Swiss-Prot record:
A UniProt-annotated Pfam family: Ribosomal_S10
Species classification: Bacteria, Bacillati, Actinomycetota, Actinomycetes, Bifidobacteriales
Keyword Nucleotidyltransferase recorded: no
NCBIfam families in alphabetical order: PRK00596.1, rpsJ_bact
Keyword annotations of the record: Ribonucleoprotein, Ribosomal protein
Biological role: Involved in the binding of tRNA to the ribosomes.
UniProt-recorded Gene Ontology molecular function terms: structural constituent of ribosome; tRNA binding
Classification via HAMAP family: Ribosomal_uS10
UniProt KW Endoplasmic reticulum keyword: no
Domain of life, per lineage: Bacteria
Protein name: Small ribosomal subunit protein uS10
Subunit (UniProt): Part of the 30S ribosomal subunit.
Length: 102
């Protein structure tokens, strides 16, 4: 697979879980003999929701909720077949979203 690059994007609501998953991916791929660039932290997406506390009136009383999406980027340069095979069999937590592009 000379001249190719695999780009992995990780998304999660918990920054500790995403860092552990990125570390696990980097360790597995480097043990398989490929070179890794990253993990690169991408900007955190922050969604804020404003909700009126009362069901009928008191519009001045509001509550704010926020949801943060943490993102990481990992590039695998010139992946070996062993590295690709180890990526296919890696076990990651369920709350981490993974996008892989070739």
């Amino acid at each position: 697979m000379a001249g190719q690059k695999i780009r992995i994007r990780l998304k999660s609501y918990d920054h500790e879980v995403i860092d552990q998953s990125a570390k696990k991916i980097v360790e597995t791929v480097t043990n398989a003999g490929a070179t890794v660039v990253g993990p690169v932290p991408l900007p955190t997406e922050k969604n804020v929701f404003c909700v009126i506390r009362s069901p009928h009136m008191y519009k001045d009383s509001r509550e704010h909720f926020e949801m943060r999406t943490h993102k990481r980027l990992i590039d695998i340069v010139d992946p070996t077949p062993k590295a690709v095979d180890s990526l296919m069999h890696i076990d990651l937590p369920a709350d981490v979203n993974i996008e892989i592009k070739l």
